[in-house]
């Protein structure tokens, strides 16, 4: 193993020690919670709960990434980073490796959920693969935006801004959909929805959407890493 990778893994292990400082049992609990809840809801014909469960799941996996930042800012825990024989750039790389680990845990949870829905014969099992891919993309874009902010500002400010932005977007979406439903004739809405469904069923679009999704997620992570390095290198520990 080359020195660079050894240095990054040392920083990654330190971050993982922070995340698991209260115990490691929450890891399998977090991974299994979504499959159990969604599969149980599907078996009871309560598929409407799925959206709320996955919204909570994204929040949990965002907290995994936020926890090392909280640990560092409480009791001046960040001073240890100045003593660790790892360069700051490698410390950031270790933090992004933790980001990818949390994304991997979310992916495992999605795959288990898909399997559970298929076993109980849930109506949404056929298209859940696309939902899981979209969920992964949203998570990667979200943490790509949050990570540089957590290097630049306090975790309290980032958490507050995050909640404000999410609530604003939710109210905007609900208000927009309500306005569209009230102002646009029903026949026009039916034609538009039929067009969207036909577009979603077009198998030719799947490779194109996959390439766009992978490219945008990779670009977001690359830009996020560069910005995080710049903020952290300029930060006084």
Name what the model sees in each region.
Residues 1-76, 94-237:
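Hydrophobic alpha-helical transmembrane segments of membrane proteins
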Residues 77-81:
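Terminal targeting/leader modules
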Residues 82-88:
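Short helix-to-coil transition segments within interhelical loops
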Residues 90-92:
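Alpha-helix N-cap/helix-start motif at helix boundaries, enriched for small hydrophobics
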């Amino acid at each position: 193993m080359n020195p660079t990778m050894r240095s990054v893994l040392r920083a990654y292990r330190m971050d993982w020690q922070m995340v698991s400082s209260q115990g490691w049992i929450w890891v399998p609990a977090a991974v299994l919670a979504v499959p159990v809840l969604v599969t149980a809801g599907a078996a009871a014909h309560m598929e409407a709960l799925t959206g709320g469960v996955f919204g909570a799941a994204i929040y949990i996996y965002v907290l995994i990434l936020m926890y090392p930042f909280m640990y560092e800012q409480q009791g001046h825990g960040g001073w240890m980073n100045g003593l660790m024989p790892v360069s700051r750039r490698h410390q950031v790389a270790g933090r992004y490796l933790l980001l990818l680990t949390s994304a991997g845990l979310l992916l495992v949870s999605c795959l288990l959920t898909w399997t559970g829905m298929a076993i109980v014969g849930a109506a949404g099992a056929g298209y859940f693969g696309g939902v899981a891919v979209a969920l992964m993309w949203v998570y990667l874009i979200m943490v790509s935006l949050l990570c540089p902010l957590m290097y630049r500002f306090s975790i309290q400010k980032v958490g507050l801004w995050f909640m404000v932005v999410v609530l604003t977007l939710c109210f905007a979406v609900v208000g927009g959909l309500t306005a569209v439903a009230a102002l646009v004739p029903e026949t026009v809405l039916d034609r538009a929805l039929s067009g969207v469904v036909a577009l979603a069923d077009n198998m030719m679009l799947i490779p194109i959407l996959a390439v766009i999704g992978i490219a945008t997620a990779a670009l977001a992570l690359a830009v996020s890493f560069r910005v995080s390095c710049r903020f952290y290198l300029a930060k006084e520990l």
